[in-house]
Regions:
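Short, well-ordered alpha-helical packing segments
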Residues: 40, 92, 110-117, 125, ...
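N-terminal structural segment of carbohydrate-active enzymes
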Residues: 1-122, 130-132, 137-141, 145-148, ...
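Active-site-proximal helices and loops of the catalytic beta/alpha 8
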Residues: 143, 159-162, 166-172, 177, ...
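Short, acidic/polar
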Residues: 28-43, 231-251
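Short glycine/proline-rich turn/loop motifs
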Residues: 11-24, 88-97, 204-234, 238-239, ...
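Active-site beta-loop-alpha junctions enriched in small/polar residues
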Residues: 9-11, 56, 128-130, 262-264, ...
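Aromatic- and acidic-residue-enriched segments that line the glycan-binding/catalytic groove
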Residues: 59-88, 129-211, 298-310
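Hydrophobic faces of well-ordered beta-strands that scaffold small-molecule active sites
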Residues: 2-6, 51-53, 123-125, 257, ...
């Protein structure tokens, strides 16, 4: 199994005259069409078996598509004008920047999946289960799918079937270093009340600029502020929502998921959801995980592959760069 990571927005961008802090019209953007047959043939000849398409699900971006009902995200909670591909705005949508015709973005994604399959390779995409964008709003979810947080009890920090964690009666405070942006225009502000916990487990209304302040932590039924107690007596609401998202992309022809920060989501969810997925789909699951003591738990939950940066990668780096003994491998 040889995986090629392909960041779509940079792969096909031939613009070499880049402007610092420039927008799409100035710096350009790759598209699915940029991944042409010549590129696919070259990857096939290289021995690639799986192409990992990075940054395809719609995420925070300061580029607006009003004709699609998509607004630009607030600069106070957007990392760079192009946005972080791990700050998801709509789990059921494709980044319109990556399409020749933004109205046709889903079909253009399905086309690249088909063309990769025609070359005898498989498709992996990112699945970001731990957090989503602060301004998340789905414009493309199926009619029978409810939006995140619609029925949450916002008067408590935790409830099993809440999708988010809350800081009751407290307003979200933009990191101080970013608030200077607001002075450039009196129209720029961001209001969130009550504040929601940030993606890197910051259960406070005042994340720092080094936190994942642009994202909101999803609630899988663990009460982190009360002894990490688990509330899995019945399936939490978030579990059903996230399983449905993976099923949606499998139906689009996706063969597997590189799961972002899988270790921040309870292993019990993976055991349940991977079993549910594999009742229907032959899906590959790859976990981003940096805690070796958890490796076995996540493999036994159904993951096919895990990152081994902390184990093998760091050991090899220490041997090559710092003179560590080779018998430490």
């Amino acid at each position: 199994m040889n995986i090629y990571q392909l960041f779509v927005r940079t792969f096909g961008n031939k613009n070499t005259e880049l402007i610092q802090n420039g927008d799409k019209s100035q710096n350009g953007c790759g598209t699915f069409a940029s991944i042409n047959n010549n590129a696919l043939n070259s990857l096939k000849e290289l021995g690639i078996t799986h192409i990992w398409l990075t940054g395809v699900i719609r995420h925070s971006s300061m580029t607006a598509f009003p004709e699609l009902g998509i607004k630009s995200t607030n600069p106070l909670i957007t990392k760079g004008k192009a946005g972080s591909p791990y700050s998801i705005m709509d789990y059921y949508d494709i980044d319109p920047d990556l399409a020749i015709n933004p109205q046709n973005r889903i079909a253009e994604f399905e086309d690249i999946v088909h063309r990769i399959h025609e070359k005898g390779m498989k498709v992996i995409i990112d699945f970001i289960p731990n957090h989503l964008a602060r301004e998340y709003k789905s414009v493309n979810r199926p009619l029978d799918v409810e939006e995140f947080g619609v029925y949450d009890n916002k008067d408590v920090n935790f409830a099993r079937d809440n999708n988010f964690y809350y800081c009751p009666n407290q307003e979200f405070v933009v990191p101080r270093q970013l608030s200077a942006i607001s002075h450039q225009s009196s129209a720029i502000s961001y209001k969130e009340f009550p504040a929601k916990a940030s993606g890197n487990d910051v259960f406070s209304p005042t994340p720092s600029v080094n936190d994942w302040y642009d994202t909101i932590k999803l609630n899988y039924g663990i009460d982190y502020l009360n002894g990490n107690t688990k509330h899995f007596d019945t399936i939490p609401n978030t579990w059903y929502k996230m399983l449905n998202i993976m099923q949606y992309w499998c139906d689009k022809g996706v063969d597997g998921f590189r799961v972002d920060m899988a270790e921040m989501v309870p292993v019990e969810f993976w055991l349940w959801s991977i079993n549910e997925l594999r009742d229907i789909y032959d899906v590959i699951m790859i976990a981003e995980i940096y805690q070796p003591h958890l490796y076995r738990d996540y493999i036994e939950a159904g993951f096919d592959y895990l990152y081994d940066k902390v184990g093998l990668y760091n050991t090899l780096e220490n041997i090559y760069r710092h003179g560590q003994r080779a018998d430490t491998i």
